[in-house]
Amino acid sequence: MSEPVLRTENLTRRFGGLTAVDNLSISLAGGRVHAIIGPNGAGKTTFFNLVSGLLGPDSGRVFFRGRDITGCKPHEISRMGIKRTLQVKSVFPKLSVADNLWITRQARSRFLHPFRSAASDLQAKSDVERTLGQIGLTGLAGRPAGTLSYGDVAMLEIGMAVISEPSLLLLDEPTCGMSPAETSRAVAKIRDLARTIDIIIIEHDMDVVFGIANDITVLAQGAILASGTPAEIADDERVREAYLGRPEDEDFVEEAIHA
């Protein structure tokens, strides 16, 4: 059996009297899209923060492809091949789409030269062009990022994460705020990325979750409530009660059960 791409052992993080992540042990296989879902306050983003090094655990360990990365700094974890996006989108609004990608690529490869243009670096230019295609923004390469639609900004941020070719991508609510058309395009692009990058996604849109994930873990109060395939999760009474039982989700749950 191959080593899991990500594994945690008894991971715990508290904020005062609140236990945000509670003794969480999880093993995520490579070559799949794994969704983390749960009600607000379930510990999903805190889990991402612990994996990416933005927070340190009170106890427990984090392993990436068998390597203990507990306590590593965010830039160290990034260089190991883990990249992430944030709920609050962060781009350079006055720079073009292409320059956002270029400057991120250069900064993360530690070859940032402020007075060197993207055109003078053939490899960087090639990486930018490749990434523009991956995120579907080739036609907007010259547009200032601040003039993009919300959906295109979200895709640009994903591009800024993948331009350095990570092996694990953490997506924190990538479709939040998107129109249905933007969501559909984003899902298609994320599926394409998943062919070569392991992806863990936090998402509240159940259509997105059940349409894109191979495996789903449900968190509640910082602990694992259930884990399994989309059909197994949709058919789990505990999940229905805790998360999927809202009236607006019922039709889709029934579809997932019988898929």
Task: Locate predicted features.
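Glycine-rich phosphate-binding loops of nucleotide-dependent enzymes
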Residues: 2-259
